Amino acid sequence: MEDVPMPDGSMLIDIVTMKMPFGKYKGTLLKSLPVSYLEWFARKGFPKGRLGNLLQSTLEIKMNGLEDLLVQIEKNIIAK
């Protein structure tokens, strides 16, 4: 796997709030995409640009058991 960009605050917020714009999981929040789908992108190639970076970061977060981080961010967004 290529070097994953270090998620910044805006990336983490986008992972929690942005929906997949196309494909099998169109309309699904990025944070809710199954690992198998993200792994498929890892094998086939992530989309270029911000979406690809977000998907790659989402996979890394899930693979490293850091999903609680996304839960906390989501709670903070809802609380505002």
Where are these regions (language model features)?
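DEDD superfamily 3′-5′ metal-dependent exonuclease/proofreading module
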Residues: M1-K80
